[in-house]
Every structure is written in structure tokens, then in C-alpha cells.
A protein has these predicted regions:
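Bacterial N-terminal signal peptides that target proteins for export
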Residues: 2-13
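Bacterial signal peptide processing site
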Residues: 26-28
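A short, structured loop/turn motif at beta-sheet edges
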Residues: 102-111, 140-146
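Long compositionally biased, domain-poor regions of proteins
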Residues: 40, 47-49, 86, 120-123
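A short hydrophobic beta-strand element
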Residues: 109-119, 133
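Short beta-strand edge/turn micro-motifs at domain boundaries
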Residues: 131-158
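C-terminal motif of bacterial Sec signal peptides marking the signal peptidase cleavage site
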Residues: 22-24
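A solvent-exposed, acidic/Ser-Thr-rich amphipathic alpha-helical stretch
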Residues: 32, 36-39, 53-103, 127-130
Length: 162
């Protein structure tokens, strides 16, 4: 093997090693990965609502400066105020939801999810009632990388056909 081929092979080998190193140091999150991560976070949020109650779940997943917007009501500003409205009587109802889709901005600091919810409760006559709806949550990625809900809004939908 000539000296030219040896030096060229060595040079190419070094370039490959350096290129591989630089690529591994400059990996950016795949937007589809972050989108799936956000969708999974909303699913965990929904599961916590079933396990611990909606008030506790919202208290955990809302950003400190979150805004809650329920149909027919004034917006509720701040995580603590939203929690105060939800915690009393949370054992009297169940709020379940199923995230349908998530999207994340190219900057990966904002995203949104939407889905369908069912609010179940026992009325004054002891009969189980269900209210159906859809929601849209706007999420903000925190400094620690976790997603928190910045805006929670929802409105009612007709009951699904049986």
C-alpha cells in the first residue's frame, strides 16, 4: 500500500471519528419524540386524575401561572386558584379524559394536546350522571424539561351514540 493511501485512509478515519463525535454532541431532540413525550405526559395527567382525583392532578400538572377556562365561567388565574376550585368535593366526581393528539412547536418550548373527557357524578337522587366534552391544553416546557399546562380549556359535547 502506498504512502498516499495510508495517509488518506488515516485522514478519512480521523474525519469519521471527529464527525461522529461532533454529531453525537450536537444531537437535537427529534420533534416527533418530544411530541410523543408531551402526549405521554397528558396520559399520565389523566391517569393521576383517576388515581388521586382531578384536583390533585391539576395541582401537579398546572404551571404556577396557569389559566383555567371552563365553558360558561370566568377564567381562573393561577395554579393555586384552580386547585382551590377543584379540591373541595373532588371525591364526589370523576374526571376522565383521553388525549387524542399532541403537537409541539419547532422551538420545543410550547405544545398543545386535545382530547375528549367524561365528567361522572352522582346527582341528588342518587343517579349517576355523565357530562361529555372536549378539551384543549396549551403546555409550556419548564426549565427542568418537564411539561406543565399553561392554559386548560374545555367545552361540552353531546353524549356519544350507543
Amino acid at each position: 500500500m502506498s504512502a498516499f493511501y495510508k495517509s488518506t485512509s488515516k485522514f478519512l478515519g480521523i474525519l469519521l471519528i471527529i464527525g461522529g463525535f461532533m454529531t453525537s454532541c450536537n444531537i437535537q431532540d427529534d420533534p416527533s419524540t418530544e411530541k410523543q413525550r408531551l402526549l405521554n405526559t397528558d396520559k399520565q395527567f389523566a391517569q393521576m386524575s383517576l388515581d388521586k382525583g382531578a384536583g390533585e392532578a391539576f395541582n401537579y400538572y398546572l404551571a404556577d401561572d396557569a389559566m383555567g377556562m371552563s365553558a360558561g365561567q370566568q377564567p381562573v388565574m393561577g395554579r393555586e386558584n384552580n386547585y382551590a376550585e377543584m379540591k373541595d368535593g373532588q371525591e364526589d366526581y370523576t374526571l376522565a379524559w383521553e388525549p387524542q393528539r399532541a403537537e409541539v412547536a419547532a422551538s420545543e418550548d410550547l405544545g398543545w394536546t386535545w382530547g375528549k373527557y367524561v365528567l361522572s357524578f352522582i346527582d341528588d337522587e342518587g343517579v349517576e350522571q355523565k357530562r361529555y366534552g372536549k378539551y384543549l391544553n396549551i403546555w409550556e416546557r419548564q426549565d427542568d424539561g418537564e411539561w406543565k399546562v399553561l392554559v386548560d380549556m374545555g367545552n361540552s359535547s353531546p353524549a356519544p351514540e350507543k
